[in-house]
Amino acid sequence: MSKVIGIDLGTTNSCVAIMEGGEPIVIANSEGSRTTPSMVAFTEAGERIVGQQAKRQAVTNPENTLFAIKRLIGRKFETEAVKKDIAISPFKIVKADNGDAWVDVRDKKYSPPEISAIILQKMKKTAEDYLGETVTDAVITVPAYFDDSQRQATKDAGKIAGLNVLRIINEPTAAALAYGLDKKKDEKIAVFDLGGGTFDVSVLELGDGVFEVKSTNGDTFLGGEDFDQKIIDWIADEFKKDQGIDLRGDKMALQRLKEAAEKAKCELSGSMETDINLPFITADASGPKHLNLKLSRAKLESLCDDLLRKLEGPCRTAMKDAGLTASEIDEVILVGGMTRMPAVVQRVQEIFGKVPNKGVNPDEVVAIGAGIQGGVLKGDVKDVLLLDVTPLSLGIETLGGVLTRLIEKNTTIPCRKSQTFSTAADNQPAVSIHVLQGEREMARDNKTLGNFELTGIPPAPRGVPQIEVTFDIDANGIVHVSAKDLGTGKEQSIRITASSGLSKEEIDKMVKDAESHAAEDKKKREAIEARNQADSMIYSTEKSLKEVGDKVDAVEKGTIENKIADLKKVMDSDDAEVIKKATDELAQAAHKLAEAMYAQAQQAPGADSCGGDCGQQQEAGAKPKDEKVVDADFEEVKK
């Protein structure tokens, strides 16, 4: 069995880890970084670029550079969270036929799982380059508070990327696994995970290799992106006050503001004040305009005060659901890049009444935990048991539009639960099962996961038929529901893919598209390598022609020059084979040059042309006769 990789598919950055020699290690990407920006760009030439390369060109290509796509995954277009994103996004977010939020880039629509798959492919390739072998099995992390459709969409992304997703694991649980793997004592810990786009808090009990999640809570639309947006709005408002120009209407300027905001936020974690300098940010009739502002840490904290206040509620709820007080929690583990912000650390300290533990790398710990879980599933890591929970209650709609819960939130998974219901009317031939997820009392206020019908119920007075509804949640937190007429034994089931999820046909098509793109990428890489080789061949041959061209036959020299011209003609070709063929032909023709150079080297002064004296070799270590060497005796004077 090949290696199982652990991938932290983050909103802002992604990371990949594996178990090697019994230890989890984070793998650096081709640029040498241990984290990769979760960005995908589509260039004018039709090329797809990922990670740091995509981030570098974002300012000049804002409409076709996708970021924070995780905030759209598994979400409907009509939700408030998506509407909020549409208002500030430089790229187009559109409504798909199934009601999902998709993106439109260069007149082509893409689903969030499809874009996430491109990022996952980059992480897969990073691992493959390091291991020197093909990787197919993976553990992928998701925010603990992701609902069923978001989990399913993440699993779909893995499939599109050509991965066999062995397990979807919650990010705080993965972090706890990385933190507690070598801990021997029993501990109650809280994992506070504030990343680029999501916020989770989980309370766990650790001991004897058992990691038991007691409760989880969070907000899947709160993270570093929101803090950045506060700074962007402040910069735009200040510039408008000063210059009378609203930069929000200029997508290129807005992208520069985004980069500056992120940089300023990071700098203010280590200093009390930072400068924001953006020359030539825009122009009007009077000429170019420059932006120069100072932002203090105190100002940043006041701008983000409402976001900082939002952190307390989920923490209090998680502790209450776990049946613990703040004083009973032994350690608070900080996860996610946003936990570097001093105001966040201070807020955590106030909520839990203790200094949080900074012993783990907040950017890498989730991927490390996923890598460990991969080792557990493969059998490389022994004596580790992970008991996770479902973050939200699950149930069905019953008479009067009420949500009847079958599985309460924070129930340990995998789990299975059944309940018997009946008909609401006489001679009812079918029942419609409306599956929901959430904590509100009325069905309409919760998230619909799916609908299905159980038909063929024999005529009977209301309340007589016995319909058994069973909920089954697997270890990935993905829901399966079945309904059975106990009278006839007739059964109908549904594997929840969410009413807005991708169909099997759509996923299969996206898998094929991803495979064809991978083949295209390989072809492009081979062409670039062939071009580089050809370029090197042309350079060395032309150099040799200058040096010894007069030593070869004029006809042969003409042949070589023709072959150089032929190779230059095909250099721009996308076909690696054509370039290689022309390179080989030039190499063959250039053999005569190599012979001439060798002959010239043989005749050069100092070469092995010493005639009869060659037999009289100098002894090893002897000095040449013309060197001024003085031989002298010495006498040791004893004191």
From Swiss-Prot:
Residues 622-639 have a biased composition (Basic and acidic residues). One of its GO terms (molecular function) is unfolded protein binding. Induction: By stress conditions e.g. heat shock. Residues 601-639 are annotated as: Disordered. PROSITE patterns: HSP70_1, HSP70_2, HSP70_3. Pfam families: HSP70. Keywords: ATP-binding, Chaperone, Nucleotide-binding, Phosphoprotein, Stress response. Acts as a chaperone. Belongs to the heat shock protein 70 family. This is Chaperone protein DnaK.
